[in-house]
Regions:
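Flexible, acidic/His-enriched mid-domain "rim/lid" segments that flank
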Residues: 5-100, 110-112, 153-167, 171-182, ...
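Conserved small/polar residues in nucleotide/adenosyl-binding loops
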Residues: 1-5, 341-347
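Flexible glycine/proline-rich, aromatic-decorated loop/lid segments
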Residues: 25-33, 139-154, 161-169, 213-224, ...
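Acidic/polar loop patches that form or flank catalytic/metal-binding clefts of enzymes
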Residues: 12-13, 99-100, 177-191, 203-209, ...
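Intrinsic disorder at enzyme termini
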Residues: 279-339
Length: 351
């Protein structure tokens, strides 16, 4: 078929992705080495797809808050990593339109959390203790779209180091989610927003900050990604276009002790167009609280506190109508506003 259809004609092929057998057959012909044009078309979700993704995340948020209520009630009763994975699947399965998990659940307690893509099985499964963190990276396919979320939960009293590091990761998540940027930037330009707070403390994470997410397809899907390394071919960071959905997942991993990752899904939207150019922004799709008890509030500036409070207020507003009275009371507690620092200015201040 190749010979019949392509004799004397150039062939468009993505050399980084085709298999070696096809490459050998194409080698003697004229090859136009280009990314599959449908890749970008898939990545740029249309208005209906973005709206449906928002609906999927509401369902996911409802299921996740119900799971958090269960977690809060049972953390002292000897639950395991697999118990958490199974409970999340149970709650998601109750949602209309649920199809399946979008990937194998990552539930990692304590030192397991420092293994970036650890997944529990019967041999490795451990019981949570009343200390440290459990890192939970899970997702689902619904008829409306795909979700991918990571939350790291405190299992008891945390050390100052643990709370400080959680807060550094949170600062990165908030900064990237709040980005306002000129059209034409790639993930490589934006990555520093998520890492800056960690870098200032000599910390980092050895994975990308974000990956493209498909619409009821692959949970990892290009060409958009957010990583600072300047790659080539399939690793080249694409221009972030309106409609592209990308994960926002900074983290920090302390070998032998714990791991922290906080992941939301964000969609790129047009912000404004003026004499300086086209400006983009992100809208966060994920609707699940952060663990407010794991945050060192003193490390947040006033803008970060505002972002956190606004996010939690929105979570409460959207999810609360779908909960029973006890779950609502619980949600009110875990989305409570953090206090701002009110400065008393001198009477002769010109500010």
């Amino acid at each position: 078929m190749y010979k019949r259809q392509s004799k004397g004609r150039p062939i468009l092929a993505d050399i980084d992705k085709i298999n070696y057998l096809l490459y050998k057959k194409l080698f003697k012909g004229k090859i136009l080495n280009m990314v599959n044009p449908t890749t970008k078309m898939k990545a740029m979700k249309n208005e209906t797809e973005v709206l449906n993704e928002a609906k999927a995340h509401i369902k996911d948020g409802i299921a996740y808050v119900k799971f958090l209520y269960w977690f809060n009630q049972n953390i002292s009763k000897g639950i395991t990593e697999l118990d958490i994975a199974n409970k999340l699947l149970e709650e998601r399965s109750k949602m209309e339109g649920f199809i399946e998990e979008s990937f194998e659940a990552i539930v990692a307690y304590g030192s397991h959390g420092a293994i970036v893509h650890y997944s529990p099985d019967e041999a490795s499964n451990i019981e949570l203790q009343d200390k440290s963190f459990v890192l939970i990276d899970t997702g689902a396919h619904y008829l409306e779209g795909t979700t991918d979320i990571t939350r790291t939960l405190a299992c008891g009293e945390l050390t100052k180091e643990e709370k400080d590091n959680y807060t550094l990761v949170l600062k990165g998540n908030l900064a990237l989610g709040d980005a306002k940027f000129l059209y034409g930037l790639t993930g490589a330009n934006l990555d520093i927003l998520a890492r800056s707070a960690l870098w200032r403390k000599g910390l980092d994470y050895n994975h990308g900050t974000g990956h493209g997410v498909g619409y009821l397809m692959n949970v990892h899907e290009g060409p958009n990604n957010i990583r600072w390394r300047l790659g080539k071919g399939k690793n080249l960071s694409a221009v972030i276009e309106p409609g592209m959905i990308t994960s926002n997942e900074p983290g920090v991993y302390i070998t032998g002790k714990y791991g922290i990752r906080l992941e939301n899904m964000i969609v790129c939207k047009e912000r404004e167009k003026n004499d300086f150019g086209r400006f983009m922004e992100f809208e966060t799709l994920t609707i699940v609280p952060f663990d407010i008890n794991a945050i060192n509030i003193d490390m947040l500036d006033e803008h970060e506190k505002m972002l956190l409070n606004d996010y939690h207020k929105n979570v409460n507003k959207i999810i609360s109508p779908f909960l029973d009275s006890k779950e609502k009371e619980f949600l009110d507690r875990i989305t409570r506003a953090v206090s701002y620092t009110h400065l008393t200015l001198p009477t002769n201040s010109l500010v």
